[in-house]
């Protein structure tokens, strides 16, 4: 859909959920950062001069707001519409007060769905694998001739892609799914459900309820793709997958699992295949198994998701900085080639460790603990460990990478140095991407020193 294909208005957006979006009143962007910047650009494109609020705005964000004509908000005022960033809890005091004064509180996903109702969206959520599955679905749809763009919880923000896509493939976090009441997706995917974000949701039940909002607005003509062992209440048609087979809805095998490229997880590929098929059928497009098979063979894994970033002799270095959920860390431990030097650290968010002990048994030779809660996590894991102390995140990562390599025997050693940190990045880094970049830089530095010493890399 090209920009302007759906009529725009500064008064009222298209109806969805039986309610209009009031862009003619006072609109507040609550929270900047990646999502807020996407909202700001989108509203500017709609001809809307909005207000914004952020407790600690970055100088570049303030400059962008001025450039786009958005003004800093007075929270003592009243607003008709508040577009809140996903990281702002739904029960935040400011939002409760604003709602009490008559504001409607929504998120970027609801804004996109209401103002671009003709754009088909595939929504993907889950505790682990949702980003990789999102990218895979978009790759498959592009191979089938559709202009599919991925966005949402992964880069870029959803609102950055809605005017340059025939199909939006949207990764949806539990935070985003708290603000999409009634969202109807022709195709929705749940990759799995584990434990995460208890600091935000308070309980596993509340976290799972937020995730299941992805199918709450679906109807009998829509499709929900889910794991075969995960029952989900829904009005949609249910299609299930397992990691053992890459097949279409009728059971026809498209590709042997063994033919997937390295770094592409079979469960993610199986879910992506079924979702792509469902969307093609929704649009009345042909489903060609040969095209889909070729696309799977050529699939590109997502950077920073269990990615091999270096090799020094028989020791590989794998970056999985985003692996902070138990289910994701467990998957990384089971996939990595043993023996493993496991880099664990960051800020503990209450991950369940028992499954990780089981996955590490007989595979992990040493835990390298770094960051704010690394030592505490290592002690709770009950595995042999050493603690890295450093002033900065980069220095900590340099030492952790070298310690991991040495734990595997250094030159002449074998195995995997695995960054699957369990803890979040916010103790020493801006986000998981910056932490992953630090790991990559540390690996390259180590490779450089060893190459200079005559070792093969």
UniProtKB/Swiss-Prot annotation:
InterPro entries: Mur-like_cat_sf (IPR036565), Mur_ligase_C (IPR004101), Mur_ligase_C_dom_sf (IPR036615), Mur_ligase_cen (IPR013221), MurD (IPR005762). It is found in: Cytoplasm. The keyword ATP-binding applies. It holds the Pfam family Mur_ligase_C. Its main location: cytoplasm. Keywords: ATP-binding, Cell cycle, Cell division, Cell shape, Cell wall biogenesis/degradation, Cytoplasm, Ligase, Nucleotide-binding, Peptidoglycan synthesis. Its EC number is 6.3.2.9. It is an enzyme of class 6 (ligase). One of its GO terms (cellular component) is cytoplasm. ATP binds at residues 126-132. It catalyses: UDP-N-acetyl-alpha-D-muramoyl-L-alanine + D-glutamate + ATP = UDP-N-acetyl-alpha-D-muramoyl-L-alanyl-D-glutamate + ADP + phosphate + H(+). Signal peptide: none annotated. GO terms for molecular function: ATP binding; UDP-N-acetylmuramoylalanine-D-glutamate ligase activity. It comes from the Bacteria. GO terms for biological process: cell division; cell wall organization; peptidoglycan biosynthetic process; regulation of cell shape. Pathway: Cell wall biogenesis; peptidoglycan biosynthesis. Belongs to the MurCDEF family. HAMAP family: MurD. Cell wall formation. Catalyzes the addition of glutamate to the nucleotide precursor UDP-N-acetylmuramoyl-L-alanine (UMA). This is UDP-N-acetylmuramoylalanine--D-glutamate ligase. It comes from Deinococcus radiodurans (strain ATCC 13939 / DSM 20539 / JCM 16871 / CCUG 27074 / LMG 4051 / NBRC 15346 / NCIMB 9279 / VKM B-1422 / R1).
